């Protein structure tokens, strides 16, 4: 057996998320089917760094798996890409130690969220951005995001469907910038881990701060109250990208 670490990108639009589900097209399912074809029927299980939801994209998802035989990394890259659909690209393949695990070896992740501005939805980027047609003070958002940096209890920002009890996470960076070319604002969050829907809830809250509907330091209040209902909104899946996983 040879142990591989593979980095890939995908357009999440036509996937029912990353994780295998019965009778659904998923990223994990497509990967495992391709690898099983390469082994001529011997099942290959793939571990991912995390589960992305339906409609969420990845610029740098990481998987790991054991493969029977010893294929050079570059050959694995080419072989996998030859079996990928148009909405998945294998970016890099590496042979790693057997104890490497895409999820459990990860030290941190970086997510990006794109928000399209303008009153009307652009039909050509609607599957790749969120959309916010209301006024925004980006400087207010910049101030607010500084309150996220550090170690906090993110109970208010975790979707009710999650099963993880410990909701304390550390955020190393939280930024927002304007892209005048695309008329978008782009959020980035880098932390040691993220709860279910956490980034999308943080973005929805930040947009309400930028719109003046919330106090500029409302993140601090939401940390204290530990109440998901008070954070309210969740930004659409379409604007979210898993940008990078750190090891």
Swiss-Prot record:
Protein name, per record: tRNA pseudouridine synthase A
Alphabetized UniProt keyword annotations: Isomerase, tRNA processing
Organism whose genome encodes this protein: Lacticaseibacillus casei (strain BL23)
Top-level taxon: Bacteria
Keyword check for Isomerase: yes
Reactions it catalyzes: uridine(38/39/40) in tRNA = pseudouridine(38/39/40) in tRNA
InterPro entries for this protein: PsdUridine_synth_cat_dom_sf, PsdUridine_synth_TruA, PsdUridine_synth_TruA_a/b_dom, PsdUridine_synth_TruA_C, TruA/RsuA/RluB/E/F_N
Subunit and interaction comment: Homodimer.
